[in-house]
Regions:
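DUTPase catalytic domain/fold
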Residues: 1-100
C-alpha cells in the first residue's frame, strides 16, 4: 500500500549550470508507523524537471516516524540555468506501508 504527497518549492531559485543545490519545500511530511506495519518514504523528482537536466543527487529513503520538511538535493546537468518558481511542484514523496 502507498500514499503520495506532492511537494512544492518554497522559494524561487535559479540553479546555475553544474551546481549542486538544496531545495527547500513548503510541505511538512510525517511518515506514520503503525503497530505491525513497516513504513518508509521515497522522493521522486518530476519527470519534466529530469528531462530539463535536473538530477536528483540523494536517493536515501525517509525512515518510519520521520517528521519534517524534506530537503531535496539536485544538480543542474544542463547547458543553461534552470529556474524553479515558488509553489512549483518539484516531485512526490511516496510513502510505502508493508505488513510484517
Amino acid at each position: 500500500m502507498y500514499k503520495i504527497e506532492k511537494l512544492t518549492v518554497k522559494n524561487r531559485c535559479e540553479i546555475p549550470v553544474g551546481s549542486v543545490v538544496e531545495i527547500e519545500v513548503s510541505e511538512e511530511v510525517h511518515i506514520h508507523s503503525d503497530l505491525g506495519k513497516q513504513c518508509y518514504g521515497q522522493f521522486y523528482l518530476r519527470k519534466c524537471l529530469a528531462k530539463k537536466g535536473l538530477l536528483q543527487c540523494v536517493h536515501s529513503p525517509f525512515p518510519a516516524n520521520w517528521k519534517g520538511k524534506p530537503l531535496i538535493v539536485v544538480k543542474n546537468d544542463d547547458v543553461a540555468p534552470i529556474e524553479l518558481r515558488a509553489d512549483d511542484e518539484i516531485g512526490c514523496l511516496w510513502i510505502f506501508t508493508h505488513k510484517y
